Every structure is written in structure tokens, then in C-alpha cells.
From Swiss-Prot:
Gene Ontology cellular component annotations, sorted alphabetically: cytosol
Catalytic activity, reaction form: N-(5-phospho-beta-D-ribosyl)anthranilate + diphosphate = 5-phospho-alpha-D-ribose 1-diphosphate + anthranilate
Residue intervals passing through the bilayer: none
Gene3D superfamilies: Nucleoside phosphorylase/phosphoribosyltransferase catalytic domain (3.40.1030.10), Transferase, Pyrimidine Nucleoside Phosphorylase, Chain C (1.20.970.10)
Alphabetized GO MF terms: anthranilate phosphoribosyltransferase activity; magnesium ion binding
Subunit composition and interactions: Homodimer.
Protein name: Anthranilate phosphoribosyltransferase
Binding site for 5-phospho-alpha-D-ribose 1-diphosphate: 82, 85-86, 90, 92-95, 110-118, 122
InterPro entries: Anthranilate_Pribosyl_Tfrase (IPR005940), Glycosyl_Trfase_fam3 (IPR000312), Glycosyl_Trfase_fam3_N_dom (IPR017459), Glycosyl_Trfase_fam3_N_dom_sf (IPR036320), Nuc_phospho_transferase (IPR035902)
Pathway(s) where this gene product acts: Amino-acid biosynthesis; L-tryptophan biosynthesis; L-tryptophan from chorismate: step 2/5
Enzyme Commission code: 2.4.2.18
Amino acid sequence: MIKEALARVIAGQDLPEQMAAGAMEAIMTGAATNAQIGSFLTALRMKGESPAEVAAFAAVMRVHAVQFQVRGGQGRLVDTCGTGGDQAGTFNISTAAAIVAAGAGVRIVKHGNRSASGRCGSADVLEELGVNLAMTPAQEQATLEQAGIVFLFAQTHHPAMKHVAAARKEIGIRTVFNILGPLTNPAGADAQLLGVPEPSLLDLLPPVLQTLGVDHAMIVCGGGLDEISTATATEVVEVKGTEILRYTLTPEQFGIPPVNIAELQGGDVHTSAAIIKGILDGEGGACREITLLNAAAAIYLGGRAVDLNEGVRLAATSIDSGAAAVTLQTLISTSRGET
């Protein structure tokens, strides 16, 4: 199936759903060679992935994932996993926003990995903050129940990705797997804040999310940043069931003066972790403001706020009341099995 799919993609043709699924099945089971995988991913990138292809790939990956079964609880499960690859070198904004949103009462099931192309992935910074990435299923359940947030480490929940690692590293370009990460949450998150670095993905992903059954999502692209930006305008596509809304957000709408992207730089993992600690300890400035705005979106998607303005207020309260800092400490201790 992989050879037939490769030939079709090289010819510039989109794959039928069944053929796309068959190709991904070959990859996930180790039936495809590194040469075939590398060629297939490169050809797909050159052709441009179609929504039907991406949805089929994601469905197969979900089947091969180690699922996280959520026990009880009320409200939506929200993920703040972006595609990464924006090369902006910012601190890990989505992780800070996830912790703040959890402190505001949103149930966060953050799916992520170590950095592939940026300086610091969500797994890297959480580990630096003290979170145990090698959690047992019981520890994962405990972190969600007690902290309101769990980190689902991609390396644990997607063991079949080992078949792709070598080819991805060798070709060294963004591939469809950068897109698939946020679409394959092991908990089946029903709401997502999904950051993308390329405006073209704003058109690709809405029908994919609808096909996969996501209830509510915001796909955001902040001038090449895969977050809601405070440096420039952010293009947003909001998916609510069958409805798709497109609009632009600016920092000025929320009373935030535009910042220079340099003010959001994270450097290495130690610096990024220190910035997040500072935000949770109540430090002001550009890093706090962009965290508030992205946390606001997660709070809105989680159904705790009627709009982003209310979300910003709730995010600020989460930090200023100390709830967000307590959330991080609870996440750390429960991930280690200490409570």
C-alpha cells in the first residue's frame, strides 16, 4: 500500500481515504522502510496534504495510541498543543497557558513531546519544572483529578512513532506529523487551542477537526507564531460543531500594547522554566500578558468564560490568587506519586 500511495502522491494526486489510512497503517506497524517513509513524507509536503488525508492519518494513529481513559469529572477536556515549528524561540507559552487555565478550573489534557525544531518543547520545560514524564496510568489519573491538568507524553502514548523517528530526523523538514501531533490526543480532548505557524493550515485543519469529532476549537496563527500573539495580529479560525468562524484578534482589543517578539524569547529550557515560574509567582510584563491571552482562549474553550475578555479576567485571577502556582505544585507532586 505504501508504494502505491507514494506513486500517487508523487504524481500530485490526493489519496483516497482508504489508501491514506493504509499507508499510515504500514508506517505505524513498521511495514514501511525508512526510505519509503522519508520519500512519502517529503512527497506529501511538496504536494500539500489534503484534509481527507490528514483525517485518515490521525484516525489510524489514534487506533495505535495508548489511550488515556478519563474517569468521571464534569466539563470539557481541553488541549493546548500546537504544531510547533515556528522557529520564533519564545518561551513555552502554551504550557504556561495550560497551567493558568487549569488554575481557573478548566480540565486540561495537554499532549506534547520534547522539542523537535524549537529550543524547548512542552515535555522539556515541564521536566525542568519538576514534573515526572514517566507517569504510570494511575499517576496520570491522579494528576488530572487533583491538579486539574495532566501531561500526556507523546513518547509514552504513541509507541508506534518509533517507526517514524529515524526518517523524520534524517529528512529534517516539517512533515505531516507536525500537524498530526495536536490531532492525536490520547484522551480524545473535545476542545482544542491549536497553534499553527503557517496561515495555510488555517484552511486545512477545520474540516479535519470536524471529521475527528472535536466539539470546539480555535486554530490560531499569530504572524508566524503558533500562539495568540501580543506582538501582532492573530488570525483565528474557530470551529464550533458544524460552524466555522474566521476573525482577527489584536492585542489592543484586550488593552495590551503590542510588544516586540524579543520580549517573549525563552532561550534554553532553564530560561523558559524560570519565565513560567515568574509568571505564576505574579511577575508582570510581556510574558504574563501573552500567557493571559492564550489561557483566556483555553478557559473560553473549556466553557468557563463566555468570551475571551472574561477569559482574560479569569486567567489573571488564577495567577493573582495563587491558584495557578498551586496547580503546578500539585501537578509536580502527583506526577511523582507523592500525594
